[in-house]
Amino acid sequence: MTSTGQDSSTRQRKSRHNPQSPLQESSATLKRGGKKCAVPHSSPNLAEVKKKGKMKKLSQPAEEDLVVGLQGLDLNPETRVPVGTGLVFDEQLNDFHCLWDDSFPESPERLHAIREQLILEGLLGRCVSFQARFAEKEELMLVHSLEYIDLMETTQYMNEGELRVLAETYDSVYLHPNSYSCACLATGSVLRLVDALMGAEIRNGMAVIRPPGHHAQHNLMDGYCMFNHLAVAARYAQKKHRIQRVLIVDWDVHHGQGTQFIFDQDPSVLYFSIHRYEHGRFWPHLKASNWSTIGFGQGQGYTINVPWNQTGMRDADYIAAFLHILLPVASEFQPQLVLVAAGFDALHGDPKGEMAATPAGFAHLTHLLMGLAGGKLILSLEGGYNLRALAKGVSASLHTLLGDPCPMLESCVVPCASAQTSIYCTLEALEPFWEVLERSVETQEEDEVEEAVLEEEEEEGGWEATALPMDTWPLLQNRTGLVYDEKMMSHCNLWDNHHPETPQRILRIMCHLEEVGLAARCLILPARPALDSELLTCHSAEYVEHLRTTEKMKTRDLHREGANFDSIYICPSTFACAKLATGAACRLVEAVLSGEVLNGIAVVRPPGHHAEPNAACGFCFFNSVAVAARHAQIIAGRALRILIVDWDVHHGNGTQHIFEDDPSVLYVSLHRYDRGTFFPMGDEGASSQVGRDAGIGFTVNVPWNGPRMGDADYLAAWHRLVLPIAYEFNPELVLISAGFDAAQGDPLGGCQVTPEGYAHLTHLLMGLAGGRIILILEGGYNLASISESMAACTHSLLGDPPPQLTLLRPPQSGALVSISEVIQVHRKYWRSLRLMKMEDKEECSSSRLVIKKLPPTASPVSAKEMTTPKGKVPEESVRKTIAALPGKESTLGQAKSKMAKAVLAQGQSSEQAAKGTTLDLATSKETVGGATTDLWASAAAPENFPNQTTSVEALGETEPTPPASHTNKQTTGASPLQGVTAQQSLQLGVLSTLELSREAEEAHDSEEGLLGEAAGGQDMNSLMLTQGFGDFNTQDVFYAVTPLSWCPHLMAVCPIPAAGLDVSQPCKTCGTVQENWVCLTCYQVYCSRYVNAHMVCHHEASEHPLVLSCVDLSTWCYVCQAYVHHEDLQDVKNAAHQNKFGEDMPHSH
């Protein structure tokens, strides 16, 4: 799938390759018999490429995708990068307030406080100011109905009593004679920034406006909001500037249901909201605010909700949601514009949000978003009601937009258990729709650390903000330092002029940096040789002295000396050049730590990361990065926390060995491994190598076991693994072993990372360590690709936004396997990799509904095409009249409820199937606003139908406050019918066929239909379903439960006992025969969790993972929390079938 495939291909993943069992790491270290300069043989030759090309005929859809993708390419390297941050701040927006309540939180004082803070920090003068303008009525009509706009316009002429009467017909709003004009001005302010941004007048922007807008719906005021500014801006950008894909990020503490309802059928707008939910107890009390609501119809998968179910959520929780969910999906969606509903009511001290985020945290969120859409980013103020916190939050985000480094986070950057659960559930709901979210075999085995210890760690690591920290923002004259010396070209191969590690490497890089004007933007720093004392921090004195003797050796002796090492050549200048390269890195460290520059690049050679304490290796003599790290710690006078990221395609064995017992240095390497056959050979680069002694867990190896790894694979590793660990480590300095031999065209690497990809990797790391980051050149042997790649990284260091990644394919399955393998290894060391606790997983994973997506339209869906009502809205219909549904909440495992929802959804999930039904999706959305509806509870109580729907464009179904004992139970599975009322569902004529009256209600209340563990307890008549709904084969395929095709715990299955298998045995503990399971390790029989839960107790005591149902012969893995169907289970299943039915199983698949 290409990056532009959102407009022409289905969002449902086309194929799900079964992940293979990862090979066991070899315990023996392979001898390094191969040479580093050997060319990998896995790449196809020219003849194969030509043959393959002739066999592939470009289809029309693929050609259209290619054309759209090429539109994003910039073939002119000297194109001017837009500069400046736009700001709209108009005093007229303070011309309204609540006439009857002076204490109303949405007040003019909010903007006054912001303005004072921006003046205090000198930010107003650094921005490009734009005059606010009024939005035209035609522009508002891109989202809102004309009748609603006209109604709002009449408020200009109402007196206070009339305004109050009208305001009371809505939820949480007030009206003032100037409310309409200010709302128009607020919307127009955002549109002005859109024009400036798309016209390359600015790089990004912020609209400091009021009233807020994200709760406003098509024809409904709500939650202080009259017009939905960002929704109008998205439609405006699509119409005027031909933007095809817009990302809207809503980090306001309240769910922006208005924005969600406007776009929940539209695949051209991706909506992401992270908000306080508390299982529906927090405003706006909607099921549509939960993780299970993902949009419907063509927009299924394009609505993302991350609900916080407790207060006090911190920066770490928000950052984790961005890393694990938003950034991966956005990288596949590839937005062309990012709009942020920037509410700051999640900051510590806000009376409404009751969260514990800090201004620095919002600076980091802003920075992460600046890597998307080529940097085209607009923040629009929404909520925030603690004046001091609001002002600090706005200023922090504005600092980041202006290019200032993100402050270091003071709290422990580890998400809490509740956040991990919410993130996991959201991922579960979204995984079928986004290829980048596909998780390979990522087992959820219990960590070796006891659960009690983990909980104690969380308690000890808990952080509670007592006050907003006074963030400091460094003012630097020079942002990026550059160190280079042509003397390093003196190191050369006297016997082979075509050796890949050629002196031309650094010369070509410098020439390119000068050609594109980047060198002139940097502060040129003089290189110096490393001192012996600096070298001795990482290398032995004997080795240094031995290398020094090569300066006076004869040519024949130099050749013999080089042969003593692995992949090494030596000339008389080698020792001096190696000292100069290492000293240059140390000089750059001095400049960064002293504040002379913020970050820097060292264009040096020979490279260093293979150099061992006592030996040269792989073109390397002195380990420049390692020496620079030790030099930084000496300057600081303490064990400075240093992150070393090594993205050279070869594993940095030398760096790993130097720091493998040091917890002050986190070493992360991404490299080709090919199961130990890629240089430097052996098992040092395996994922199982995690360090030793005090440094255990601080060595992280991401081994690629094949070629062609590209941008998508590296970004997946960044999002899932590198950045979560890095944020938890919270480094004070970042050093990058910047080898570019994983770049496209490199003769040694065989990978496909683009210069743009390296720019993104650099940008994402720049949020760490207060922006103190240094790139030190390692490998890279294609002169063109290393020059362009280093230039791309330099652009990022200078603050230029990373370019869009065009034609980005999904991550390779082999890459996902490697990443998952590393995550499994390091979960015990890094809490940020434990997405959720085991006992919470069942909430999300049981009976997950999967519906094939419709092919999205190539153009955005207009508001009129979706939900525009006909006729004027009567005044009494404006009032929100939502009533909680009667009946119980549907639990996750209820087979009848889930199957019925699946079948009902089946009739509505495709345009072809919809032809035979009287249900209109647009009408249904007008009625319930896209909220989730429990159809079974509705069908069971038809007398309540009139009270279960809302007025036109109402908020949707409210979430009733659950009893205390049920606060952790949530409804699952967003159906495509998330806007259908119970009354309208009767139009399908199927409920009568299923006879779902009191019988359905009884089935709903019983636990016999639960699919959690014992599918054998299900008593649903599938034939009745078939008769009621026709042949499913003619419609979209759906699955109530999809078993795993492989499980890492299959090795726990033991041979069938000699006495055979008796599935009629009673439970060993209680003697029941009602519903039992047999353990496939010890073959003892116990009852299910829905009888007396003795099999659950057996699993907890024995840790035996796999069990077989004596009822329906299904196999369940307690550790994976999923059903498993694999050929290794066929023998035991067949034996059980023979015992139960007296014959072999009818089929073996």
Curated annotation (Swiss-Prot):
One of its GO terms (biological process) is regulation of mitochondrion organization. Residues 1-61, 954-975 are annotated as: Disordered. Zn(2+) 2 binds at C1067, C1070, C1087, H1094. One of its GO terms (molecular function) is histone deacetylase activity, hydrolytic mechanism. The modification Phosphothreonine is found at T958, T961, T967, T971. Its main location: cytoplasm. GO terms for cellular component: aggresome; axon; axon cytoplasm; caveola; cell leading edge; centrosome; ciliary basal body; cytoplasm. Its cofactor is Zn(2+). It holds the Pfam family zf-UBP. It is found in: Cytoplasm; Cytoplasm, Cytoskeleton; Nucleus; Perikaryon. Deacetylates a wide range of non-histone substrates. Plays a central role in microtubule-dependent cell motility by mediating deacetylation of tubulin. Required for cilia disassembly via deacetylation of alpha-tubulin. Alpha-tubulin deacetylation results in destabilization of dynamic microtubules. Promotes deacetylation of CTTN, leading to actin polymerization, promotion of autophagosome-lysosome fusion and completion of autophagy. Deacetylates SQSTM1. Deacetylates peroxiredoxins PRDX1 and PRDX2, decreasing their reducing activity. Histone deacetylase domain 1 mediates the E3 ubiquitin-protein ligase activity. Belongs to the histone deacetylase family. HD type 2 subfamily. Forms a trimeric complex in the nucleus consisting of BANP, HDAC6 and KHDRBS1/SAM68; HDAC6 keeps KHDRBS1 in a deacetylated state which inhibits the inclusion of CD44 alternate exons. The complex is disrupted by MAPK1/MAPK3-mediated phosphorylation of BANP which results in BANP export to the cytoplasm. This facilitates acetylation of KHDRBS1 and CD44 variant exon inclusion. Interacts with SIRT2 (via both phosphorylated, unphosphorylated, active or inactive forms); the interaction is necessary for the complex to interact with alpha-tubulin. This is Protein deacetylase HDAC6. It comes from Mus musculus (Mouse).
